[in-house]
Amino acid sequence: MAKKSLIEREKKRQKLEQKYHLIRRSPKKQISKAQSLSEKWELHGKLQSLPRNSAPTRLRRRCFSTGRPRGNCRDFGLSGHILREMVHEGLLPGATRSSW
């Protein structure tokens, strides 16, 4: 189980990312279209003035039940060992154990 402070920090980052998503998107598009170097520097300055935690690269996908940051399955939002336990218990509809 992850510390609650880490989980709350991640939630705060998600809120910031959603809040600044549109604001961050427009300068990034303009940077790719900018022709002069001075324009690019100016647009980079605008991006750097935004909060650091509003960047989508700072988000980390965590397990829904335990908060574990590694070994997550995107389809279910669970880490590998929790996913395995829930499939064995039949708690995930449509998920079956593999056998060949």
Curated annotation (Swiss-Prot):
One Pfam family it belongs to: Ribosomal_S14
Molecular function in Gene Ontology: rRNA binding; structural constituent of ribosome
Biological processes annotated in GO: translation
Keyword tags: Chloroplast, Plastid, Ribonucleoprotein, Ribosomal protein, RNA-binding, rRNA-binding
Highest taxon, organism lineage: Eukaryota
Assembly and oligomerization: Part of the 30S ribosomal subunit.
Family statement: Belongs to the universal ribosomal protein uS14 family.
Family matches, as HAMAP family: Ribosomal_uS14_1
Its job: Binds 16S rRNA, required for the assembly of 30S particles.
Name of the protein in its database record: Small ribosomal subunit protein uS14c
Gene name per UniProt: rps14
